[in-house]
Amino acid sequence: QNGNKNSLSKDELAGWKLFSEKLYCIACHTQPYFTTFVAENNGLYASYNGKEDQGRFRIHNDSSDIGKFKVPSLRNVALSFPYMHDGSISSLEDVIEHYSKGGNKHPLQHKNIVEFKISSAEKKQLVSFLKSLTDTSYIQRMNF
C-alpha cells in the first residue's frame, strides 16, 4: 500500500483489518513477507502417527518439533494452491475454515490458533485481502 489508501478496495481493506486485528493472522504472517520464517505447528492434524509428514521432528528428532513446518509467505498465495505443507487444502476459503475451527487441536499447535467466528461476508473480505497480495507482474514473467 505504501501509504496509498486507494490501492486496496473497500473489501480488501476490511480483510486487512480482519487479518491484522480481529483474527491476528499477522502474528505468524508478518510484513513485509507475510511470514516469520519460523516453524510452527498449525494444527493441521490432531496427531502424527507416522503416516503424516512429522515436520521438523524428522530433522531434529525433538518431540517438541512434531508437526512443525515453516510458516509460508502469503505473497502470491492465490497462485500457490493447494495449501498446507502437504497440499491437503484446496482453497483459501477452506484454509480459513480450518483455522476458524481452531485447527485440529494438536497438543503442540501454536497458541494463536484458536476457534473464531467469521461471517460469510467477512470470509469474502479476508479472501479479497489475501488475493490482493498477488504480484501480477510475477505471473507475467517468462519463467512463471
Q: Where are the model-predicted features located?
A:
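Short glycine/threonine-rich turn/loop motifs
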Residues: 1-90, 94-107, 141-144
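In a subset of proteins, long, contiguous C-terminal domains/tails are tracked
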Residues: 132-133, 137-144
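Extracellular low-complexity, Gly/Ser/Thr-rich intrinsically disordered linkers
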Residues: 88-135
